[in-house]
Amino acid sequence: MNNIRKNHPLMKIMNNSFIDLPAPSNISSWWNFGSLLGACLALQIITGLFLAMHYTADTTTAFSSVAHICRDVNYGWIIRYLHANGASMFFLCLFIHIGRGLYYGSFTLTETWNMGIILLFTVMATAFMGYVLPWGQMSFWGATVITNLLSAIPYIGTNLVEWIWGGFSVDKATLTRFFAFHFILPFIITALVLVHLLFLHETGSNNPLGTSSDSDKIPFHPYYTIKDLLGLLLLVLLAMMLVLFSPDLLGDPDNYTPANPLSTPPHIKPEWYFLFAYAILRSIPNKLGGVLALISSILILAIIPTLHMAKQRSMLFRPLSQCLFWTLTADLFVLTWIGGQPVEYPFITIGQVASILYFTLILILMPMVSLIENKMLKW
């Protein structure tokens, strides 16, 4: 019998990726977040498309066009809040996805891991540009402060910033180009996701034990399709609780004030998912040093496969490494909290200590403890 699912050129690709894909039999719920990220991306593209139909990328009308979407467009309010809180869901899943990769040693699949880092940077750039579009106070000043960081680059910095702005300050040209980039980037992200999956399917998934799964595999469908569906339902529940009960919980009240270049808000801060990096940036008094620390805080992920000293791939049976992993998690929570606080004592000191601890844990303590564990296990 000619099975269309297995023989049709397009269906065959879908079949080998999502239906007959051999998957490890023991992957836990921490492996759900890849599919949840795919769902978040789809949600963002769909809601974003409908928002773009009513939004105007002009400094005089951008703010009122967002208000118009919420007030006059049919279900515009839910589309807008799904898009805004969808970004938070996206980053929540992203951080858990990366955390799982660190804990279970998935970074040893270097091509997939490096592709993931490129994806992280692209998603962060997209989210930043999206935050500028409503043209509220925090949008305008966030754009000014973050783009201004590029002026720390020696020699070409100032020219680079003015080139990005399209003038001598954040203005109409900046908003228009940010909208254009914000629209195109999710489609680039989709293409990168396909490459990410291509690399993953070359090697197959890791599992909680960190061992080879070749001896025991099960088909992706129905086992993991059902499992992913449960994760999706829980994510939808969380998203709907946010959107329908407290849609502005994660936003900034300052963004309900139209952008005013003549009045600076008392505390300029980005969305919650950038606060950890923002805290690291602020903890260094030097501008260039701060920018380097900011970039390093994310780029450090690229050298994690090199820093992996343990003979075991996963942290499942390495209690000392587990302690350091959860210390790192707690440290990131502290940095996120500090990023949202004003620049004054004691927050400055706490931020500096947390920033030093972040780099020390990853660069020194984790590799050292891995070597100690190897010795303890007589490896």
Swiss-Prot record:
Alphabetic keyword roster: Electron transport, Heme, Iron, Membrane, Metal-binding, Mitochondrion, Mitochondrion inner membrane, Respiratory chain, Transmembrane, Transmembrane helix, Transport, Ubiquinone
Binding, a ubiquinone: H201
GO cellular component terms listed in the entry, alphabetical order: mitochondrial inner membrane; respiratory chain complex III
Cofactors demanded by this protein: heme b
InterPro entries listed in its UniProt record: Cyt_b/b6_C, Cyt_b/b6_C_sf, Cyt_b/b6_N, Cytb/b6-like_sf, Cytochrome_b, Cytochrome_b_C_euk/bac, Cytochrome_b_N_euk/bac, Di-haem_cyt_TM
Binding sites annotated in the UniProt record for heme b b562: H83, H182
Membrane topology: Multi-pass membrane protein
Pfam families tied to this protein: Cytochrom_B_C, Cytochrome_B
Compartments where located: Mitochondrion inner membrane
Protein family according to the UniProt entry: Belongs to the cytochrome b family.
Reported function: Component of the ubiquinol-cytochrome c reductase complex (complex III or cytochrome b-c1 complex) that is part of the mitochondrial respiratory chain. The b-c1 complex mediates electron transfer from ubiquinol to cytochrome c. Contributes to the generation of a proton gradient across the mitochondrial membrane that is then used for ATP synthesis.
PANTHER family tied to this protein: CYTOCHROME B
Subunit structure: The cytochrome bc1 complex contains 11 subunits: 3 respiratory subunits (MT-CYB, CYC1 and UQCRFS1), 2 core proteins (UQCRC1 and UQCRC2) and 6 low-molecular weight proteins (UQCRH/QCR6, UQCRB/QCR7, UQCRQ/QCR8, UQCR10/QCR9, UQCR11/QCR10 and a cleavage product of UQCRFS1). This cytochrome bc1 complex then forms a dimer.
Designated name of the protein: Cytochrome b
Organism from which the protein derives: Eulemur flavifrons
Record gene name: MT-CYB
